[in-house]
């Protein structure tokens, strides 16, 4: 039995459906399982719509083998082919990691807010004017509000978008 159920509620859609069609502006932008929609959103709308909070996005420029993310230089990971020009880097709050030390693949950030949600903590960080949400792993010590930290933005769950569509 095939059933088409229309909803604007992501939780409802992901709970009832084996396969979800996500539409925006009258166009289907991704069809897939809940896991596929969450892990590799094919469109920035899907990344924002699926998940709570939605995916973080950072304006990024790719030039040569380097990235400029909010004015900070980040080297493109080995083997990752990105189109030149303006991109968006997308990463979910669950996959961002906070460090006190600058490392490859990190961006400098300032902690603006720490929320204790009960089972986890949500940290809001400012990366050159763009606010990012970081969901801390259980038992992780939260940084203090005002602290300068580094966010690991490059990893296996990082997505890159050009013209709102997934390119890497």
Which residues are covered by each model-predicted region?
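Conserved H-loop
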Residues: 1-6, 9-15, 35-36
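Hydrophobic Walker B segment
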Residues: 14-17, 49
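Short, glycine/charged-rich "phosphate-handling" switch motifs in NTP-dependent
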Residues: 19, 31-32, 40
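Catalytic metal- and UDP-sugar-binding loop of GT-A-like glycosyltransferases, i.e.
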Residues: 22-23, 91
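Conserved ABC ATPase "signature" C-loop
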Residues: 25-27
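Short acidic-hydrophobic catalytic motif
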Residues: 35-39, 47
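Non-catalytic connector elements of ABC transporters
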Residues: 53-57, 65-168
